[in-house]
């Protein structure tokens, strides 16, 4: 007992008692379900318990509309109902895997109108024992039931290629698709940011669906371990949402203005799904030995480049030391400001760091900043600086890109299942309708590095067959523009670029060919031909006089004159370009040869948009409403800007506008870009569709099927496939015929396709270069030293072929 503020009958609180009181005062915060799920210390059992609870809380409202089918008899009955309804939406669930070759089909989601959303469990398992649960269907059951779907039933999917591949790889059944709502959405508006099922359903059907989003609950938890009835609440709605999207899209495509777009969807974009599905599953052989040799070759080049960079940096040694000791360097090193933290110049300098490279260029070497005023270290800026160290840095980046993106990356993508590379091709990857690809990006392998493409090969007894559309885009342009000079060049079998050059330079056709009548090189003709080719391709790709001038190493004025002379010789082409731009300004889009639309909303922008920094609001006392007050000054200012006669007058008006509390958005750059895109979108989109039509025809050609030909890779205007060696001549013939045939109806100039066979991709081009080097005096020994990606035997064969 002691006397204290607590009274004489109580002891003072002891130290441990104080701690206890603090705990009572500040109880420990209760973790949320999300925090527990994301904690590395939470057991799988506890995570599953939380998931089961949260799913029922959030999605329990869907329980009356959800059904789990656990027997084959029930599934047969449901499909019979779908046969009567003439439509069935299908979606797959896998064991958290996106690789069709290795994943398990965990469940199937289906929906037909008037019925409940159905989930069919297939491979759910006990989380503790990994043992497959009872009362589920097998993959064989699924295959047999899907085979009962009538031919007149429309099968709907979202991202159908993936679901088709999963079903085919796990059940061996090839399920057709009639409507892919992902592709349907893309054709209706390629400018949308997201084409995933949930985003499309939210944006087009039900904006409240976000409150039911529970995707994050399953992080790091295998779907297979989730209770079947619980998981059904999450998964079964996918097929229903796919069907509702189909209903929405069907109404859109039925509109009169979408007639051509619907035809493109049905005749090209849907049939190509089957082609790409099979092509991806086929895969392509990768020559790993060549990849190793290429890796060694380019790593040696990279090491040599690093050595030369160090030699070049040594020239700046005194400047670097001086800067390190300067107050500026000390300030950057000590600063804790986020913008400057980490700007220390390390020893040696890390040139892969854009920050350190900027210090070297702009602080130490005192080079002038680009026009933007930013300390940029991009490729364009480094080229303009024109310093040996900058050239070496670009060279180093090039080697690192080749190694990291292609040479070392491609062999890593080879599947362990069959030892082949299975690229992924995406129909919604490019807004013009071209395919994009990944794992790896076969559409973007540098054309100047032929040896990288030679990694793509075939198995023993097979050969690659390749065919490309010769001058595909210029031929389409000639047909669409109806330019007689271009059309006649193709009809007469002449070299288009030599014909164009003869018009531009006002001389004879023969004077503009690369070779004269005796087969000798014609340097002047080659130069003129190259110049007009740059102009034509510049028009196709939306490039201006600046870009063309840089490519041809001439002034902007000279490039401008060349472009003007070009259009004088081909006035119909200029008229057609103007017509495309005018159509886009009126409608907000352009349309390619087969109806694909490229929406260019920027072309309809005002050149200048003047706006007040503060909104002016007007109150209506009679109606009790308020709205934004119309500002007449805005119209006046925009009129002045649009009619300014020169740059100085424009600057004066701009100053007046800003002094009165207004601001200006200059949209001229966006408008110009959209105008340039008009031509590119129409021509590139038409070419993309032509290539897809060719792929469909080749894929469905029974002659090629009997010969064992399979498509492997499409690259813009080129199709690559493989076949048994003994069938190569017929395969080349039929492949070229099919490609030419698809354009006959819609293009008024004949397409030309050159088909060839080779042991690996680009072997023919590479072999020709080797032969040319040998012919020009390079010895076999020197060729072996230079081209280490090839064996001596390969090089010997190339020389004598």
Tell what function each PLM region has.
Residues 113-155, 284:
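Nucleic-acid-processing active sites and adjacent nucleic-acid-binding tracks
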Residues 89, 153-160, 464-466:
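Acidic beta-strand-to-loop metal/phosphate-binding motif
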Residues 702-757:
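C-terminal structured "cap/appendage" subdomains that terminate the fold
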Residues 224, 281, 415-418, 422-423, ...:
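Conserved catalytic core of nucleic-acid polymerases
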Residues 173-190, 197-199, 354, 493-497:
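Conserved beta-strand -> loop -> alpha-helix junction used to position metal-binding or nucleic-acid-contacting
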Residues 254-268, 272, 690-715, 719:
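Active-site palm subdomain of RNA-directed nucleic acid polymerases
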Residues 96-98, 108, 161-173, 185-188, ...:
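Short active-site loop/helix that positions an aromatic residue
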């Amino acid at each position: 007992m002691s006397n204290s503020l607590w009274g004489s009958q109580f002891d003072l609180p002891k130290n441990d008692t104080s701690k206890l009181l603090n705990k009572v005062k500040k109880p420990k915060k209760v973790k949320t379900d999300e925090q527990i799920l994301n904690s590395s210390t939470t057991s799988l059992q506890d995570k599953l318990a939380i998931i089961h609870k949260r799913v029922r809380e959030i999605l329990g409202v869907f329980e009356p509309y959800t059904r789990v089918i656990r027997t084959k008899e029930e599934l047969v009955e449901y499909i019979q109902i779908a046969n009567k309804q003439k439509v069935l939406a299908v979606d797959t669930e896998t064991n958290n895997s996106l690789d069709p070759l290795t994943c398990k089909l965990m469940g199937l989601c289906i929906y037909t109108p008037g019925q409940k959303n159905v989930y069919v469990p297939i491979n759910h398992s006990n989380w503790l024992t990994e043992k497959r649960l009872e009362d589920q269907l097998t993959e064989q059951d699924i295959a047999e039931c899907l085979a009962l779907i009538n031919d007149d039933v429309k099968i709907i999917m979202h991202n159908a290629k993936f679901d088709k591949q999963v079903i085919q790889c796990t059940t061996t059944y090839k399920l057709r698709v009639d409507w892919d709502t992902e592709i349907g959405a893309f054709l209706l508006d390629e400018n949308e940011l997201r084409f995933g099922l949930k985003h499309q359903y939210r944006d087009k059907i039900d904006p409240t669906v976000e409150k039911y989003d529970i995707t994050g609950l399953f992080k790091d938890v295998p779907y297979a371990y989730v209770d079947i009835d619980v998981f059904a609440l999450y998964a079964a709605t996918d097929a229903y949402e796919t069907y509702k999207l189909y209903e929405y899209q069907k109404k859109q495509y039925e509109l009169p203005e979408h007639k051509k777009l619907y035809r493109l969807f049905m005749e090209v974009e849907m049939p190509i799904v089957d082609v790409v599905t099979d092509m991806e599953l086929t895969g392509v052989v990768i020559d790993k030995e060549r990849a190793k040799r290429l890796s060694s070759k380019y790593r040696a080049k990279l090491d040599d480049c690093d050595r030369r960079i160090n030699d070049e940096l040594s020239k700046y040694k005194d400047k670097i030391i001086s800067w390190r000791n300067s107050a500026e360097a000390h300030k950057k090193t000590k600063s804790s400001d986020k913008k400057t933290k980490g700007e220390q110049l390390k020893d040696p300098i890390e040139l892969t760091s854009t920050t350190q490279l900027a210090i070297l260029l702009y602080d130490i070497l005192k080079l002038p900043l680009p026009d933007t005023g930013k300390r940029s270290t991009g490729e364009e800026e480094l080229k303009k600086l024109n310093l040996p160290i900058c050239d070496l840095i670009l060279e180093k980046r090039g080697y690192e890109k080749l190694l990291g993106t292609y040479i070392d990356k491609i062999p890593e993508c080879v599947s362990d299942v069959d030892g082949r590379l299975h690229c992924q091709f995406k129909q919604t990857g490019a807004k013009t309708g071209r395919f994009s690809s990944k794992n790896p990006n076969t559409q973007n392998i540098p054309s100047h590095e032929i040896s990288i493409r030679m990694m793509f090969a075939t198995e023993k007894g097979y050969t690659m067959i390749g065919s490309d559309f010769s001058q595909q885009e210029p031929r389409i342009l000639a047909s669409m523009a109806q330019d007689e000079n271009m059309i006649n060049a193709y009809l007469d079998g002449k070299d288009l670029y030599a014909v164009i050059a003869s018009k531009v330079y006002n001389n004879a056709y023969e004077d503009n060919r690369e070779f004269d009548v005796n087969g000798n090189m014609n340097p002047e003709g080659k130069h003129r031909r190259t110049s007009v080719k740059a102009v034509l391709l510049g028009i196709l790709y939306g490039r201006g006089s600046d870009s063309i001038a840089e490519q041809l190493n001439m002034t902007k004025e000279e490039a401008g004159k060349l472009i003007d002379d070009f259009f004088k010789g081909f006035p119909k082409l200029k008229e057609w370009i103007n017509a495309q731009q005018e159509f886009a300004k009126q409608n907000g889009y352009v349309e390619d040869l087969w109806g694909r639309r490229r929406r260019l909303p920027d072309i309809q922008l005002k050149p200048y948009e003047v706006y007040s920094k503060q909104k002016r609001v007007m109150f209506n006392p009679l109606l009790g409403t308020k709205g934004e007050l119309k500002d007449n000054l805005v119209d006046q200012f925009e009129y002045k800007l649009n009619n300014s006669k020169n740059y100085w007058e424009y600057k004066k008006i701009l100053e007046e506008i800003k002094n009165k509390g207004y601001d200006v958005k200059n949209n001229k750059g966006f408008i110009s870009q959209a105008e340039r895109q008009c031509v590119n979108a129409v021509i590139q989109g038409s070419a993309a569709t032509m290539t897809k039509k060719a792929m469909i025809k080749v894929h469905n050609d029974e002659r090629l099927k009997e010969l064992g030909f399979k498509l492997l890779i499409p690259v813009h205007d080129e199709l690559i496939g493989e076949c048994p060696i003994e069938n190569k001549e017929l395969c080349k013939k039929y492949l070229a015929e099919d490609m030419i045939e698809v354009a006959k109806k819609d293009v008024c100039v004949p397409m030309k396709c050159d088909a060839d066979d080779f042991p690996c991709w680009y072997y023919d081009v590479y072999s020709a270069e080797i032969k040319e080097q040998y012919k020009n005096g390079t010895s076999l020994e020197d060729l072996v030293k230079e081209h280490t990606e090839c064996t001596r035997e390969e090089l010997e064969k190339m020389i004598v072929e």
